[in-house]
């Protein structure tokens, strides 16, 4: 179907800009990504978070978490709730390891 084709072929990637301060239990619940209204991002949109990991000399991606957009701050920045993988995302980001956020077409109405 057309919806399946769009979901599979028109994803976009972005980066995590900054983590919000942790909650009272030390968990990072929100963060900022480098995509906003300019890319059509709106509240409720979903992103999968992957860590780039070398395996046998080849860069691969391993899923570490999921985000839901809470608020679009401006054309270039959105604030997201971490819905899965808060410890993994915080650890990788803090260590400077490569994290990539990939749009999840299911949330974009496709």
Model-derived features with residue positions:
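Surface-exposed, polar/charged interaction patches used for macromolecular assembly or partner binding
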Residues: 1-110
């Amino acid at each position: 179907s057309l919806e399946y084709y769009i979901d599979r072929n028109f994803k976009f990637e972005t980066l995590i800009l900054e983590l919000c301060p942790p909650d009272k239990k030390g968990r990072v619940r929100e963060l900022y990504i480098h995509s906003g209204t300019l890319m059509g991002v709106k509240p409720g949109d979903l992103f999968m978070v992957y860590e780039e990991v070398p395996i046998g000399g080849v860069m691969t991606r391993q899923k570490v978490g999921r985000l839901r957009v809470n608020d679009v701050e401006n054309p270039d920045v959105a604030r997201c709730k971490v819905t899965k993988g808060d410890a993994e995302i915080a650890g990788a980001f803090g260590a400077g390891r490569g994290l990539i956020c990939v749009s999840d077409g299911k949330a974009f109405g496709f």
